Amino acid sequence: MSRPAFHSVFADEINQYLDYKIASGFSEKSFSIILKSFDDFCSKRGIDSISFTRSDADAWAEKRKTEATTSHYARVNKVKKFLEYLNLKGYNVYLMHDVFFKATDFQPHIYTDDEILRYFQAVDTYHSERNRMEEVQLPVLFRLLYCCGTRINETLGIKKSDVDLENGIIKLIETKNDCERYIVLNDGMKHLIQRYADKTFYLIGDSDYIFLSHAGERRRGRRIYDIHRMILKRAEIPFLGDGNGPRLHDWRHTFAVHSFKQMVDSGIDMYVALPILSTYLGHKTIYATERYVRLTMSLYPYIEKRFSQRFTDIFGGSL
């Protein structure tokens, strides 16, 4: 997408900030959308000098009526980063506090071994009259979600140029935290991607997405969610609804739990396993990985028994 035009007193600084973020390896897309909203906000408030008061900050940070929690989190915290940038340049701006998610009792669905087997049997035998390419795409796409723990948007954002077939490495650009990262494929996934490339890559250019719709466009998450529901039904895995899943995103949770368990079982210390998992998942800090450790310990009590004290030492509090 092209960069929007900024018109507030912050316009030049916003453009310089976006250039700086891109040079640092971040994706411009989500920053530019939020900063365009911020630019419009500042224009409407009549801010005519590069300053940002506490009153301005309070107005910006207020949660909107129809705003999702995740959108509110991104809107406030990304503008806070921009304000920190201005502060370092010597401008008089009020620095907002971070917005945090409220604690929740929600528990993601961790797929059992039997559910995983049934699910992928249904995926591998899926047939579509609407788009025959789906029969080729879906076994690869869904296995990336489970075997690599990628988010759906990250997966649909993979382009041909992002795939290193020789070394089995995929670069993820459209990430939640707007910072590129790499995922390393195991031998099975590497072979699967190579077979997929043999069937499809000759049809697309380097800048094209590897998962295209029948219209030749980037696939939409909504369609993949609908297929996921159909696969659950065929695999006889009950769908609870109302956000209780099993959701597409629960494949990421399942990957994280299984990966942490595998590392622990192989003798890797928790102090070593945590940063490995955190980096692979694209988390900013190991604290974002805490929920997966809790999930693993609740599902496998022997791990809790072995590491409960270390968990307390790292995160504080108790299980």
What are these regions (language model features)?
Residues 1-319:
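Conserved catalytic core of the tyrosine transesterase superfamily
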